[in-house]
């Protein structure tokens, strides 16, 4: 009757065993008290001795069968049966003495039951050599306690026979006084013994047969070996010997000894010797960015160096905008090099600065004026130095000019324009040279584009090796402001140049320049040709550098404005809409008014018509057309809502400020000089091409319209009005009747990078 510690006590299952024990002990006691004294005097004193010894043997076997472990197999742990799949077969066959015996999977105990093993539904355990569950002993009868159960049956049967026999003898001798107490009690004991004698004798005989045949009650009832051969039999004598004389089987389940818990915990719950030996170190940043706290003993701490932990390379110094700009303009007179170069520091870099090379600290070139010449060491040729533009070259980004009230805004802060035409041409050559070094490799011959009929310009400059972006940084700050060469050459405005010059395709050619390939034709119907994006963006420059450029630009522009005697002819061009019948008639025509230029919408032919623009040789007109063509050729287009909002502002009766509607916030209120071109801008990865225009020989407008039928567009409406209503009157513009596209006799060619060519009727 072993019970696991977690099982609940059920009184009902103890009723049979309590009844059996009470009957056994009660009847035997009454027999020994009322019957045995007379038997001892009348028959023999050996009768009480025999019955007493037999009673003790019955009681001992009963106790062993009740409280002994029958041979319970322990259940499998959760991690023990992981190898057995839940889809494993329900049965497995094993060979026992050449005979296959089936083993069944136990879903409760999670293992295959050994042969002759069965799961007891009452005890809920798998018992080895399971015979049956006996309620009279409240225990399973298995391999370990079957011997005691069998002996209990044998001894109980003998004891019951003795009690009934000796009781009957007492009654027969006291038949005259059946009403006496001793005779009545003896008759009651005989009735109890006789009542249980038949089932006990029957059960004992059944188990005698099973023992002699080598079977269990479970095997006999289920008929496992019925009509077959029993592989577990050892013969009659061998089976009896195995049951009665074999050594006791081991116990598989051992309850842990219950020992009192005598553990005293101290408040810190830490061993003091560990605190003395272990000294925690500072938190160290591992290579993967995780913080790891390490501890070492005092002995190892004595051998540590005094240098601090390596937490990565130091961050670059932060320089305020005012100090940085002042150092650029006034170099320190302490050394000769400081007079020729500007101290440049690395701007703050992103979080991955560990994997990006630092900026170069080579010799720098100061800003070169028109009449200054800076001597310097010998330099390499331009073709060799073009190969130094390797990886990690940041692509600067020029921002698009801000639009008007209804227009678009660039997503990045606007970049200020460069100071002079020399700086502008130097920046353009930097863009072209970097694109050529990426595509061509070493000693690549750069073929510039040529603008037919354009006036010659003296603004040609060269880049020294240190003026180009090197492999260790992005486009330097000096390359934006200092296009001059430190290699002993003259400034860009001087005609005497020592080495082979490179002509940018974005500048007007000189009289001695090689001929350029003719521009390719363009058809708006077929769509534009694929163009390569500009390789340069200025969005990687730090805000400190850009702020200093803006500050210097504003100061020099104000000084130039004081010296300038003429007002600005025009501002930045408007934004052209998509090439459709609606948008081909929209162009930006600027006429000079009392306070500045007035923006006017008309056809594309109105752009270059009239005497107000000074003819085809006007460089300001060419710059305006370049900005217009670049705005027409970039994608994505501006929305119609922003264009109509600009038109509504332009249709106002009063004149507008001279700065135009499309100005960046940094340039509002500052009219540009007449001949100073404005730097185009790049936003994100958009490519804007610099387009040069020229005026070829006069051609009939009818031929142009026949070649390009898409220019013949029906009249469209702007803001609900016809194109004629949308334009300003003759009083606001000196164009007069020349605004009609049907009266022009010239064809204007607008060519750009990538083979894009526009023809505009003049």
Swiss-Prot record:
GO MF terms held by the record: palmitoyltransferase activity; protein-cysteine S-palmitoyltransferase activity
Subcellular location: Golgi apparatus membrane; Mitochondrion membrane
Annotated keywords: Acyltransferase, Golgi apparatus, Lipoprotein, Membrane, Methylation, Mitochondrion, Palmitate, Phosphoprotein, Transferase, Transmembrane, Transmembrane helix
Phenotype upon loss of function: Mice have normal brain morphology, but female have strong locomotor deficits in open field, due to a greater fear of new environments.
Chain ranges passing through the membrane: 14-34, 53-73, 149-169, 191-211
All ranges on the Cytoplasmic side of the membrane: 1-13, 74-148, 212-762
Bias (Polar residues): 471-485
Bias-annotated ranges (Pro residues): 408-417, 511-521
Active-site residues, record numbering mapped to chain: 134 (s-palmitoyl cysteine intermediate)
Residues annotated with Phosphoserine modification: 335, 603, 624, 672, 679, 722, 740
Family: Belongs to the DHHC palmitoyltransferase family. ERF2/ZDHHC9 subfamily.
UniProt protein name: Palmitoyltransferase ZDHHC8
Native organism: Mus musculus
């Amino acid at each position: 009757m072993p019970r696991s510690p977690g099982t609940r006590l059920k009184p009902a299952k103890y009723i049979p065993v309590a009844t059996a024990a009470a009957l056994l002990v009660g009847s035997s006691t009454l027999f020994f008290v009322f019957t045995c004294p007379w038997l001892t005097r009348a028959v023999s004193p050996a009768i009480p001795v025999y019955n007493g010894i037999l009673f003790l043997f019955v009681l001992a076997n009963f106790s062993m069968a009740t409280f002994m472990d029958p041979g319970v197999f322990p259940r499998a742990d959760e991690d023990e049966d992981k190898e057995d799949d839940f889809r494993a077969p329900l049965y497995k066959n094993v060979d026992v003495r050449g005979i296959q015996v089936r083993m069944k999977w136990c879903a409760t105990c999670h293992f295959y039951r050994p042969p002759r093993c069965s799961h007891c539904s009452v005890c809920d355990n798998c018992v080895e050599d399971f015979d049956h569950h006996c309620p009279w002993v409240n225990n399973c009868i298995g391999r370990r306690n079957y011997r005691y159960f069998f002996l209990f049956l044998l001894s109980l049967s003998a004891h019951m026979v003795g009690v009934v026999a000796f009781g009957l003898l007492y009654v027969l001798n006291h038949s005259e006084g059946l009403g006496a107490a001793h005779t009545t009690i003896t008759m009651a004991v005989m009735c109890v013994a006789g009542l249980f004698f038949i089932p006990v004798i029957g059960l004992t005989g059944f188990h005698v047969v099973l023992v002699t045949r080598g079977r269990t009650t479970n095997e006999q009832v289920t008929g496992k070996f019925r009509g077959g051969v029993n592989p577990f039999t050892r013969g009659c004598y061998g089976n009896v010997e195995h049951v009665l004389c074999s050594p006791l089987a081991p116990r598989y389940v051992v309850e842990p000894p219950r020992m009192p818990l005598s553990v005293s915990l101290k408040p810190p719950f830490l061993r003091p010797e560990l605190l003395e030996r272990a000294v925690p170190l500072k938190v160290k940043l591992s290579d993967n960015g995780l913080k790891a706290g390490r501890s070492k003993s005092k002995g190892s701490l004595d051998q540590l160096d005094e240098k601090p932990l390596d937490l990565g390379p130091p961050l670059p110094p932060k320089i305020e905008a005012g100090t940085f700009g002042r150092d650029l303009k006034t170099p320190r007179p302490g050394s000769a090099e400081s007079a020729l170069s500007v101290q440049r520091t690395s701007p703050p870099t992103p979080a991955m600065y560990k994997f990006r090379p630092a900026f170069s600290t080579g010799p720098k070139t100061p800003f070169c004026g028109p009449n200054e010449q800076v001597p310097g060491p010998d330099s390499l040729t331009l073709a060799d130095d073009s190969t130094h533009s390797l990886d990690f070259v940041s692509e600067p980004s020029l921002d698009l000019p801000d639009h008007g009230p209804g227009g678009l805004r660039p997503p990045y802060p606007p970049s200020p324009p460069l100071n002079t035409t020399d700086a502008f041409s130097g920046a353009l050559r930097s863009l072209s040279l970097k694109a050529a070094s990426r595509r061509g490799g070493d000693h690549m011959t750069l073929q510039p584009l040529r603008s037919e009929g354009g006036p010659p310009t003296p603004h040609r400059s060269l880049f020294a090796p240190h003026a180009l972006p090197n492999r260790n940084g992005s486009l330097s700050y000096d390359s934006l402001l200092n296009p001059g060469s430190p290699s002993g050459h003259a400034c860009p405005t001087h005609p005497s140049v020592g080495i082979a010059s490179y002509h940018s395709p974005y500048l007007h050619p000189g009289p001695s320049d090689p001929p350029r390939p003719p521009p390719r034709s363009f058809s708006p119907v077929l769509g534009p040709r694929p163009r390569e994006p500009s390789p340069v963006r200025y969005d990687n420059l730090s805000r400190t550098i850009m702020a200093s450029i803006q500050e210097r630009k504003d100061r020099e522009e104000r000084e130039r404005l004081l010296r300038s005697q003429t007002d600005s002819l025009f501002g930045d061009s408007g934004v052209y809409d998509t090439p459709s019948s609606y948008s081909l008639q929209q162009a930006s025509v600027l006429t000079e008014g009392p306070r500045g230029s007035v923006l006017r919408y008309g056809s594309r032919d109105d752009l270059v018509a009239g005497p107000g623009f000074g003819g085809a040789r006007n460089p300001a007109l060419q710059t305006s057309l370049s900005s217009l063509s670049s705005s027409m050729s970039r994608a994505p287009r501006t929305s119609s809502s922003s264009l109509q909002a600009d038109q509504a502002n332009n249709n106002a009766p009063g004149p507008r400020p001279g700065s135009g509607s499309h100005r960046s916030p940094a340039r509002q209120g500052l009219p540009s000089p007449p001949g100073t071109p404005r730097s185009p801008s790049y936003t994100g990865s958009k490519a804007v091409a610099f387009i040069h225009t020229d005026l070829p020989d006069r051609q009939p407008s009818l031929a142009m319209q026949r070649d390009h039928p898409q220019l013949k567009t029906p009249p469209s409406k702007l803001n609900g009005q016809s194109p004629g209503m949308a334009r300003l009157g003759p009083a606001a513009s000196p164009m007069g009747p020349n605004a009609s596209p049907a009266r022009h006799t010239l064809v204007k060619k607008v060519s750009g990078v990538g083979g894009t060519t526009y023809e505009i009727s003049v």
